[in-house]
């Protein structure tokens, strides 16, 4: 049992360090003024001006669409409260869920800015990324309380 606890702590520390390093590398990017659609179905997604790890619009830039607006709000929240703030991540998920409902109500007529990266691909990708972000945040926050 003690070995398992030690292994869990090591795994949590390892993943937290990897997450922090990845975010640090990604955050070194400059802000963007153009709507980008890249890697739409991977965790290295770049969507709009604000969606994607470390991907952010320049101050005063308007989001490219409704999903990008959710990402902009999330970026602002973690900037104020820290990257491991789970309430920021949950707020983002609620924003994306509202958008998903609006898309369904429009019978899929509500579309994003990109035909290359349609909402049907991008939304599941950002949801998966946020689930992973929440997991890392929980692990990181657990480690802080143990120290």
Swiss-Prot record:
GO biological process: arachidonate secretion; gravitropism; lipid catabolic process; phospholipid metabolic process; pollen germination; pollen tube growth; positive regulation of cell growth; response to auxin
Localization in the cell: Secreted; Endoplasmic reticulum
Binding sites annotated in the UniProt record for Ca(2+): 50, 52, 55, 75
EC number of this enzyme: 3.1.1.4
Active-site residues per Swiss-Prot or TrEMBL entry: 74
Tissues with expression: Ubiquitous but expressed at a low level. Detected in vascular tissues and in the guard cells. Predominantly detected in pollen.
Keyword Plastid: no
Domain of life: Eukaryota
Any coiled-coil regions, as ranges: none
Traits of the deletion mutant: RNAi mutant exhibits delayed light-induced stomatal opening.
Cystines in this chain: 31-58, 35-64, 40-117, 51-71, 70-95, 77-88
GO cellular component, one term: extracellular region
Cofactor(s) annotated in UniProt: Ca(2+)
Chain positions of motif Prevents secretion from ER: 144-147
Location (main, coarse): secreted
Comment on bound cofactor: Binds 1 Ca(2+) ion per subunit.
Signal sequence segment: 1-28
Miscellaneous: The enzyme has a preference towards palmitoyl acyl chain over linoleoyl acyl chain. It also has a slight preference for phosphatidylethanolamine over phosphatidylcholine.
Protein family: Belongs to the phospholipase A2 family.
Described function: PA2 catalyzes the calcium-dependent hydrolysis of the 2-acyl groups in 3-sn-phosphoglycerides. Releases lysophospholipids (LPLs) and free fatty acids (FFAs) from membrane phospholipids in response to hormones and other external stimuli. Regulates the process of cell elongation and plays important roles in shoot gravitropism by mediating auxin-induced cell elongation. Involved in stomatal opening in response to light. Plays a role in pollen development and germination and tube growth.
Name listed for the protein in its UniProt record: Phospholipase A2-beta
Organism, as annotated: Arabidopsis thaliana (Mouse-ear cress)
């Amino acid at each position: 049992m003690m070995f398992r606890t030690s292994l869990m702590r090591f795994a949590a520390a390892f993943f937290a360090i990897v997450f922090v390093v990845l975010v640090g590398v990604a955050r070194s990017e400059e802000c963007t003024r153009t709507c980008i659609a890249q890697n739409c179905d991977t965790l290295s997604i770049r969507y709009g001006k604000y969606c994607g790890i470390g991907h952010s619009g320049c101050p005063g830039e308007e989001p490219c669409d409704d999903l990008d607006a959710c990402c902009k709000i999330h970026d602002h929240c973690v900037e104020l409260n820290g990257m491991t703030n789970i309430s920021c991540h949950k707020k983002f998920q609620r924003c994306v869920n509202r958008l998903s409902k609006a898309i369904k109500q429009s019978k899929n007529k509500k579309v994003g800015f990109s035909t290359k990266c349609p909402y049907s691909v991008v939304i599941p990708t950002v949801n998966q990324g946020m689930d992973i972000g929440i997991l890392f945040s929980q692990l990181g926050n657990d480690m802080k309380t143990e120290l």
